[in-house]
Amino acid sequence: MSNHTHHLKLKTLKRAWKASKYFIVGLSCLYKFNLKSLVQTALTTLAMITLTSLVITAIIYISVGNAKAKPTSKPTIQQTQRPQNHTSPLFTEHNYKSTHTSIQSTTLSQLLNIDTTRGTTYSHPTDETQNRKIKSQSTLPATRQPPINPSGSNPPENHQDHNNSQTLPYVPCSTCEGNLACSSLCQIGLERAPSRAPTITLKKAPKPKTTKKPTKTTIHHRTSPEAKLQPKNNTAAPQQGILSSPEHHTNQSTTQI
């Protein structure tokens, strides 16, 4: 509709321009015939008409420009916003279903991965629990359970002797028949049963310390043959003195008599 009105206005302007041309030609003819008064009046009227027509055309163009600016801006905004805001319900439902199923599949896959690492799945929980119970019952008599205190709290473990100690359960002496190790470890009566299981500590044999004995340094001096003979003479002298001493005593006793 706006384009149709615009074409009509252009046609009217063209017709007015043609009419003004004819009017100017007629005035020029009158001027040639020396009709000045009529020409002056005609020129004044033509000037007034042109001024009014120019004002009217300016107003029309301004109004048409404003009218064009408003509808052209609105459709552009609507065209840009339509695909974002107004979507078909089928498209949205399909997207919602696809996203919902994808989220469920991802969560289930994550849970299955976690359960496979732990050794369990959601498919058969009852069978697995039964199998676990059977396995635990079958393994109970084979495994040794640690003793429990009457107070209900286990004694603190020594982490230092953890590697070198072994805990043994309570063994009555009636079961030991000819076993020396069993008879040495068994307890007689329930009253003597210890609150804590006996521990056998495996002590490591200490390594023998090797001490090096200091070596005596012997110094050999060269001696002359005369020096070697001197101690023999010295040793012989006291023997003579010892042998001559009783004779000397006898001589003294005789002189006294």
From Swiss-Prot:
GO terms for cellular component: extracellular region; host cell plasma membrane; membrane; virion membrane. The record marks 65-66 as: Cleavage. Glycans are attached at residues 72, 80, 85, 87, 92, 105, 139, 163, 199, 215, 233, 251, 253. The chain crosses the membrane at residues 38-66. The keyword S-adenosyl-L-methionine does not apply. Residues 187-198 are annotated as: Binding to host heparan sulfate. The keyword DNA-binding does not apply. It comes from the Viruses. InterPro entries: G_prot. Residues 1-37 are cytoplasmic. Residues 70-92, 118-166, 204-257 are annotated as: Disordered. Disulfide bonds join 173-186, 176-182. Residues 204-222 have a biased composition (Basic residues). Residues 67-257 are extracellular. Residues 73-90, 150-166, 231-243 have a biased composition (Polar residues). GO terms for biological process: symbiont entry into host cell; virion attachment to host cell. Signal peptide: none annotated. Keywords: Disulfide bond, Glycoprotein, Host cell membrane, Host membrane, Host-virus interaction, Membrane, Secreted, Transmembrane, Transmembrane helix, Viral attachment to host cell, Viral immunoevasion, Virion, Virus entry into host cell. Belongs to the pneumoviruses glycoprotein G family. This is Major surface glycoprotein G. It comes from Bovine respiratory syncytial virus (strain Lelystad).
